[in-house]
Amino acid sequence: MLGTAYWETNRTMLPVEEAYWLSDAWREKNLRYYPWHGRGFVQLTWKANYQKASAKIGVDLIGDPSRAMEPDAAAQILVHGMIGGWFTGKKLADYIDGARVDFVGARAIVNGKDKAAEIAAIATAYLAALPEDQGSIWLRIFKAFWGIITGKKQ
């Protein structure tokens, strides 16, 4: 998830809007899925995906697609969408579980094989940077977060 968020936000780790350096008029003219263009940590696109995310997280993203830029909504879309397979039907557990970590394959959760090796390298760097010891605050935070998302205590 961290590798995906890093990549999809143009390395900012902040929710961004697709082609944020261009005007909204440009997006309206050039993006066939406007106004449901890429937003957030994962670049949620297409009306059907906005409808699905809206129903799942309880935020009206159809009436106001820009709400996908709100950090809380963007985080929920990233996490629940990747775990639940909202984007392509592929889920995080299809590639990462207690026995294996396939960051290259995991790109299929969001966007096929597009830049999979580059994003996998980023994810690997994040994984290596997180301390492994049981006393680590990061490990405890991740385990608590994972438990909330999956409903399983760690």
Where are these regions (language model features)?
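Surface-exposed patches in mature extracellular/periplasmic domains of secreted proteins
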Residues: 1, 14-18, 88-99
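Alpha-helical scaffolds flanking conserved acidic
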Residues: 1-3, 100-107
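Peptidoglycan-targeting cell-wall enzymes and recognition modules
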Residues: 1-82
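Extracellular cell-wall/glycan-interacting regions and their flexible linkers
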Residues: 28-30, 55, 72, 89, ...
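A residue-level signal for beta-strand positions that form part of recognition/binding surfaces
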Residues: 41, 89, 107
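Long, well-ordered alpha/beta core segments of mature domains
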Residues: 62-66, 73, 90-96, 100
